[in-house]
A protein has these predicted regions:
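N-terminal secretory signal peptides
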Residues: 1-16, 27, 33
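Aromatic-lined carbohydrate-recognition surfaces of secreted/lumenal glycan-active proteins
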Residues: 181-195
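N-terminal module-boundary/linker segments of secreted carbohydrate-active enzymes
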Residues: 23-27, 31, 44-71
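Substrate-binding cleft of extracellular glycoside hydrolase catalytic domains
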Residues: 50, 56-59, 74-158
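Functionally critical loop-and-helix segments that line ligand-binding/catalytic clefts
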Residues: 48-57, 61-64, 193, 198-275
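Active-site cleft segment of glycoside hydrolase catalytic domains centered on the general acid/base Glu
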Residues: 157-179
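C-terminal region of N-terminal signal peptides and the immediate post-cleavage residues
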Residues: 16, 32-47
């Protein structure tokens, strides 16, 4: 079996025990086809494992598993005023049911939305980043999220470099001041992912060469950022609905790295206290 990549917080260790090696193997097992990265040939190895993301309702774990998915990206944020999303935020009970079914969980934060009852989160500046990071961390830990796991913060629109530099970057620096860079991830188009990495406001995956970048196909021009850990291949819209799981339309994400920020791989690795 090939050596498994360690989370960055554990890189300082010169060696790992057999017990720790087993823990990493178990943590990765939920990704199904990602077992190929551990030298385990399977028929599914040709296709990447997939995670779904959704907001409308909590989809039963067994239905997610039966549909062939390896886990979820779930919200550690509240519903906007005037809306009531059943999957926002993820709860401890639901998270436990996903884990019991052998599914992995990745955290993301999105409260506001373009044209919604609350503005896009990234427009809230440094102070907004501080507040959003504190909310995200409280909801993440309340649901059992890994102490060293990243939270992916959302830029859900097409922005240019000037807007990134003047507005979004300040928001991310506010987030960093609370969580630290290593627990900060980004969701957005390819440009946003690349800018976040270049400006040093997102952390690194335990998979060499990968960053905490969850890229959507939107605003990406059919390009995929080589350092991304997740790629949102299917974006469910009214004109192009995604597949249904448990009666609800979902977005579908390819897992591009064995360490995509899943809770169970970062459960016991602290990277400093949130402020």
């Amino acid at each position: 079996m090939h050596n498994l990549p360690l989370p960055p917080s554990a890189v300082r260790l010169r060696a790992i025990s057999r017990r720790d090696a087993l823990r990493y193997t178990t943590a990765l097992a939920g990704l199904g086809a990602a077992s190929a990265a551990c030298g385990m040939p399977t028929a599914a190895a040709a296709a990447p494992p997939r995670l779904i993301d959704f907001a409308a309702q909590q989809i039963p774990a067994q239905q997610i598993r039966a549909a062939g998915y390896s886990g979820v990206v779930n919200y550690v944020s509240l519903s906007r005023p005037g809306s009531s999303f059943g999957a926002k935020p993820i709860t401890r009970r639901y998270a436990d049911s996903l884990t019991a079914a052998g599914l992995v969980i990745v955290s993301n934060y999105q409260y506001g939305k373009p044209g919604g009852s609350a503005p896009s989160d990234f427009t809230r500046g440094y102070a907004g980043g501080v507040a959003d990071a504190r909310t995200a961390w409280q909801l993440h830990t309340a649901a059992g999220g890994g102490q060293g796991a990243p939270i992916f913060f959302t830029v859900d629109e097409d922005i240019n470099r000037d807007t990134w530099n003047r507005v979004a970057l300040q928001w991310f620096r506010g987030i960093n001041s609370v969580l630290g860079v290593q627990r900060t991830g980004v969701y957005g188009g390819i440009d946003v992912c690349q800018w976040a990495a270049a400006d040093g406001v997102i952390g690194s995956s335990g998979t060499p060469g990968r960053r905490w970048a969850w890229q959507t196909r939107a605003w990406s021009g059919h390009r995929i950022y080589p350092a991304a850990v997740l790629y949102q291949r299917v974006v469910s819209t009214k004109s192009s609905p995604g597949p249904r799981v448990g009666g609800f339309e979902v977005d579908v994400n390819d897992v591009l790295a064995p360490d995509c920020g899943q809770w169970n791989l970062h459960q016991g690795h602290r990277t400093g206290d949130a402020r």
